[in-house]
Amino acid sequence: MPFLHGFRRIIFEYQPLVDAILGSLGIQDPERQESLDRPSYVASEESRILVLTELLERKAHSPFYQEGVSNALLKMAELGLTRAADVLLRHGANLNFEDPVTYYTALHIAVLRNQPDMVELLVHHGADINRRDRIHESSPLDLASEEPERLPCLQRLLDLGADVNAADKHGKTALLHALASSDGVQIHNTENIRLLLEGGADVKATTKDGDTVFTCIIFLLGETVGGDKEEAQMINRFCFQVTRLLLAHGADPSECPAHESLTHICLKSFKLHFPLLRFLLESGAAYNCSLHGASCWSGFHIIFERLCSHPGCTEDESHTDLLRKAETVLDLMVTNSQKLQLPENFDIHPVGSLAEKIQALHFSLRQLESYPPPLKHLCRVAIRLYLQPWPVDVKVKALPLPDRLKWYLLSEHSGSMEDDI
């Protein structure tokens, strides 16, 4: 066949053997997996395996034999036929054989088709559980992390010892794959992310481009601005759930650079992202840069800058709401701080009808900073820190203390954040 070149000619040479193998198993159309679930097929599986074994023994010395059985292994991986795959492997199928088009191995294909039993079989036969494909540099764990439907394969790979923190040439780990593949509307990889974190995924993983575990969340929060209201609610709920998981496993939302800091982003738009910001502060997130302090960026400066940039008028409900939420955020900062860290040159120049209230807020913070914190405040902060992680207020209410002490331990503006989300 001189008109066929390269891998096309090779495929042409071994395709008859592949067809014969599929035919021996009663598979006419490999794309129709549902036909393999018929009771009649299951009942006759033993006889089909015998036919397959006889075929392989008869064709063992034919040209392109290994290529043919190895290609057939890809089909078995796709369909989840573990017994047939085991026979092919015992008769010379190559675990490292790549699909001529996608360059995926049988293990990659088994993951893509969510065949956890096939994954286990291939690994037990010696397949490299951390092998990356040549095109996308994806490991089986990367592929399993990208779709919620592949959760069974993700669990099986972790149980079999896949390296949860292996990264591709760009520095992207399975956790970052799971986050980047989530859109908060149609794809919710929350359980995938939970499994990876429980399996030891590093929350400090960073790509060569500087993407962190919070990059996806920050991007999705930006998508809620001016978008469909129902979709925005779904995205906010997803971001809250994932942020809660990340913080529970030690992620720091207040690290610089500012554009990669979830706390900084929520502070900049505290009216829009108020429930999530309240959760971050209740969970003990720093309101200044956690690496360099207020000299890098300060939550107090951001809040007052936003207030002063919105003059408003007395009957302006949006500005009144903005001021109310600013008071809540400031109260949470004070409630969770042993000593306030106000930025240097922290001067403001508010204008408009609410300028006096803004100035009064600023003055009260200056007063708090200028005096040593009282013992009762230090005790309040220490107890709240001890009761973390969130929800602190639920734990405070369960303490065997008089109601008056509970009231003092509670933040003045506490509420049900999950309901708000």
From Swiss-Prot:
SUPFAM superfamilies in UniProt: Ankyrin repeat (SSF48403), SOCS box-like (SSF158235)
CDD domains registered for this protein in UniProt: SOCS_ASB6 (cd03725)
Chief location bin: cytoplasm
All residue ranges annotated as the SOCS box domain in the record: 360-415
Pathway: Protein modification; protein ubiquitination
Swiss-Prot/TrEMBL ANK repeat ranges: 67-97, 102-131, 136-166, 170-205, 226-255, 260-289
Pfam families named among the record's database cross-references: Ank_2, Ank_4, SOCS_box
Any Gene Ontology biological process: intracellular signal transduction
Key words of the record: ANK repeat, Cytoplasm, Repeat, Ubl conjugation pathway
One term under GO cellular component: cytoplasm
Compartments where located: Cytoplasm
Family statement drawn from the similarity comment of this UniProt entry: Belongs to the ankyrin SOCS box (ASB) family.
UniProt comment concerning the protein's domains: The SOCS box domain mediates the interaction with the Elongin BC complex, an adapter module in different E3 ubiquitin-protein ligase complexes.
Subunit structure: Binds APS. Identified in a complex with ELOB and ELOC. Interacts with CUL5 and RNF7. Interacts with SQSTM1.
Function recorded in the entry: Probable substrate-recognition component of a SCF-like ECS (Elongin-Cullin-SOCS-box protein) E3 ubiquitin-protein ligase complex which mediates the ubiquitination and subsequent proteasomal degradation of target proteins. May play a role in the regulation of cell proliferation and autophagy by promoting the ubiquitination and degradation of SQSTM1.
This protein's name: Ankyrin repeat and SOCS box protein 6
Organism listed in the record: Pongo abelii (Sumatran orangutan)
Organismal lineage: Eukaryota, Metazoa, Chordata, Craniata, Vertebrata
